[in-house]
């Protein structure tokens, strides 16, 4: 997959589906988009370095 340096360009739904697809556990309940952006940066963007 193509992991973005700036995941904030994605929609929240897209962020969530990308995280789930990469076996990242989502926080319970509905979070602000920046929560998912942070998870994406921690788990996905970091993987490609």
From Swiss-Prot:
Keyword Manganese included in the entry's annotation: no
Signal peptide segment: none
Region called Biological activity, residue ranges: 32-36
GO-annotated molecular function: DNA binding; hormone activity
Domain of life: Eukaryota
Domain annotation LEM-like: ranges: 4-47
PROSITE patterns hit by this protein: LEM_LIKE
Key words, A-Z: Hormone
Keyword Methyltransferase: no
SUPFAM superfamilies reported in the protein's UniProt record: LEM domain
Similarity comment: family membership: Belongs to the thymopoietin family.
Chain's role: Hormone of the thymus with pleiotropic actions on prothymocytes, mature T-cells, the nicotinic acetylcholine receptor, and pituitary corticotrophs.
Name the UniProt record assigns to this protein: Thymopoietin-1
Organism per entry: Bos taurus (Bovine)
Upper taxonomic lineage: Eukaryota, Metazoa, Chordata, Craniata, Vertebrata
């Amino acid at each position: 997959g193509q992991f973005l340096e700036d995941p904030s360009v994605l929609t929240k739904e897209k962020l969530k589906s990308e995280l789930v697809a990469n076996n990242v556990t989502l926080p319970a309940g509905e979070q602000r988009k920046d929560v998912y952006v942070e998870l994406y940066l921690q788990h996905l963007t970091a993987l490609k370095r």
